Amino acid sequence: MIAYIEGKLAHKDPTFVVVDVQGIGYHIRVSLHTFSQLKDLERVKIHTFLHIKEDAHTLFGFADLMEKEMFLHLTSISGIGPGTALVVLSSMNPIELKEAIAREDVKTIQSVKGIGLKTAQRVILELKDKMKKDALLAGSDSKQNFSVSHNSIRSEALTALITLGFTKTVAEKNLDLILKGNSNSFTLEDLIKQALKMS
């Protein structure tokens, strides 16, 4: 898995970028959100997801980890492939998408090209609890920096646990139990170790 690519921005297009890393150009598909974040930077660091099919290996890129996390949530839902997930993230930024899911706004999600009523309902059904939980964590401005740090570490720990063989459901449950009501700051290593002890 290629976690991120850092290098010179050789080409930028609303649907893809080319990043030059020591003379090798990586073609990376991006959303409009990421495209707008890159602006005209000379050097970029893009978080990536490598999608492997029999006939193609495709890199998808994200300006930040929140967008990558939303992409992975979307592609975990039946009927939504990487291409459709990118269209969703081009239609609204990650925060807008989280809010639409949390308030169960079927109409907004269904307005995205390629998303029908049943798929929009499935997105809400499968992700609403997670989005509402995130919204509570980020509830007040005074806790905002803490929640961003918490969510970032949680996201990285979740990826690590899945790589170690946990199902996503079990990994999320363990992490939420550890973090619930605990105001102490965790290091990524501590969080993973505690989750492993719960298996």
Curated annotation (Swiss-Prot):
Residues 151-199 are annotated as: Domain III. One of its GO terms (molecular function) is four-way junction helicase activity. Its main location: cytoplasm. It comes from the Bacteria. It is found in: Cytoplasm. Keywords: Cytoplasm, DNA damage, DNA recombination, DNA repair, DNA-binding. CDD domains: UBA_RuvA_C. Residues 64-142 are annotated as: Domain II. Residues 1-63 are annotated as: Domain I. Has three domains with a flexible linker between the domains II and III and assumes an 'L' shape. Domain III is highly mobile and contacts RuvB. The RuvA-RuvB-RuvC complex processes Holliday junction (HJ) DNA during genetic recombination and DNA repair, while the RuvA-RuvB complex plays an important role in the rescue of blocked DNA replication forks via replication fork reversal (RFR). RuvA specifically binds to HJ cruciform DNA, conferring on it an open structure. The RuvB hexamer acts as an ATP-dependent pump, pulling dsDNA into and through the RuvAB complex. HJ branch migration allows RuvC to scan DNA until it finds its consensus sequence, where it cleaves and resolves the cruciform DNA. Homotetramer. Forms an RuvA(8)-RuvB(12)-Holliday junction (HJ) complex. HJ DNA is sandwiched between 2 RuvA tetramers; dsDNA enters through RuvA and exits via RuvB. An RuvB hexamer assembles on each DNA strand where it exits the tetramer. Each RuvB hexamer is contacted by two RuvA subunits (via domain III) on 2 adjacent RuvB subunits; this complex drives branch migration. In the full resolvosome a probable DNA-RuvA(4)-RuvB(12)-RuvC(2) complex forms which resolves the HJ. This is Holliday junction branch migration complex subunit RuvA. The gene is ruvA.
